[in-house]
Amino acid sequence: AGAGALGVSGGALGIDSTAHKGAMLAGGTTVAVLGCGLGTRYLMQNEPLRAEIRSHGALVTEFRPFTPAGKHTFPLRNRLISGMSEGLLVVEAGSHSGSLITARCALEQGRDVYAVPGSVLSTDFAGTNDLINDGAYVVTQPVQLLSGYAERYHLDLNRVPSVQQLLAAEQDPGANLPQTSKE
């Protein structure tokens, strides 16, 4: 996001929250696509993050206000996430992860699918590794995700932090990350 790309994720706990926080930390914009209506008391522990996203991006949903989250709402949310994106990055997915639904939607919509490889000894990466075996692009550094879009969208790849910089920023929020120009 610091390179000028828009980050889109699901606003959930874990990797979704990390993606939103990372986008904002890099000085970028992020969109959280919700699997419920606005005003719903879902994942109240993420309310501070949603408030921050409202200031640095947008909360998006196709559901009427106060529609509760449910098993049927998340696949619909995942379809919107992939539909709003040029490419989809799956960081960690077990064999039954909802991220695989998003990946399937992305492929059906003609989007690029990227995956971070993980240990073959961990079931937490079974789905991610299957995506790679099925032809997803492998990503081990953030710049790999954006390099194919840089010219078309005028992205500044010099502003893409390395994995090491992201890890340092997670440990020390005051750590310097490449910042997007705010001209």
Indicate residue ranges for each PLM-predicted region.
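Glycine-biased, small-residue-rich flexible motifs in mid-sequence functional cores and linkers
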Residues: A1-E183
